[in-house]
Amino acid sequence: MSPSFFLGFLSSLILVIRGDPCPCEREELCQQIRDERDFEVFVFDVGGKTWKSYNWSVVTTVATFGKYDAELMCHAHSKGARVVLKGDIRLAYIVDQNNRTGWITEKVNLAKSQFMDGINIDIEQAVEEGSSEYFALADLVKETTEAFHKEIPGSQVSFDVAWSPERIDKRCYDYIAIAESCDLLFVMSYDEQSQIPGDCIAMANAPITQTLNAYDQYLNLKIAPQKLVMGVPWYGYDYPCLNFTQNNICSIAKVPFRGAPCSDAAGKQKAYSWIMKQVSSSLSGRLWDGVQQAPYFNYKDPEGQIHQVWYDDPESICLKTDFVKAKGLRGVGMWNGNILDYSDDPVARQQSAMMWNALFGC
């Protein structure tokens, strides 16, 4: 019996024993991905079929935040990329050990039944340092990682963290313990205006100095750089201006958030595909803020109100992702992969390709 025949027979036998029919054209595509890549490109997918237009030559992990798509799983596996579950749970519930174990067991079984390769834990709740939830969260990550690694060898467990470990949005987590337990931290380097302590004005979603300094804060906690994935935004914020000055200062509504008087909740998130269409017909065209190292533009809505849109594009993104290799981080990712324009329009296709390329620096 040849080794290849034996491995194929064994794979089929495992699937039969498991009892879950493989939805892929080839049964080997239902086998979990175990290979590690030197550089991680971590994509959040929120549903639909735009994943068919991703740059699969670079994608290593897809975190599925939409409805389960067996076709996506099969395709990702054919490209050697992982597909991982979303994990979210109310922290007060998993303070109880039995509840925590039950949740983990449910997620492991779900991942197995869907032939998936791990889990991305996305818990963005406020936590007080030293509280029962504080310790329960660290335990959850540790126990989830242990269970997945045991039940699905080679699986990946990741945890999403705020752009800085400095109590952002009152998320006081045990970052050191969490980083030690899981395979990687996805640093969400966006929504950095969720708490605006000073003037209520429109600003960049991810200003460069603030963004990069925050990685030094994580590294100063002795978290290994190989545990950190830089997440960049493929979206921006559209702010209605209550007052607009000749110096392009846009005053925004006071929308408090978790103790701060103002926040980016005064604006609306807009996809990069929308932004590229809007900027071409805007009042100002693309402008550049040299301090925040970010693009923005101004436009007038049908009611005559001026809006200011802050966003990231290939120029601002690559300035940040240059830092990834300079510091030896694990890789890059984005929120989210679906919101580029993947249509047949040649201009849109070029814009989308440039966004993918920017993940690797300037």
What are these model-predicted stretches?
Residues 46-50, 67-72, 102-107, 166-175, ...:
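Alpha-helical scaffolding within the catalytic cores
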Residues 23-39, 43-44, 232-323, 349-361:
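Glycan-binding loop/region signatures in secreted carbohydrate-active enzymes
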Residues 2-19:
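Cleavable N-terminal signal peptides of Sec/SRP-targeted secreted and luminal proteins
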Residues 45-47, 66, 85-89, 123-125, ...:
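A cross-domain feature marking catalytic cores of carbohydrate-active enzymes
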Residues 105, 125-278:
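Substrate-binding surface in catalytic domains of secreted glycosidases
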Residues 122-146, 153-159, 163, 307-362:
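Active-site and adjacent substrate-binding regions of carbohydrate-active enzymes
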Residues 20-112, 135, 143, 347-351, ...:
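Glycan-recognition patch characteristic of GH18 chitinases/ENGases
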Residues 62, 121, 185, 230, ...:
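Conserved, mostly hydrophobic/aromatic
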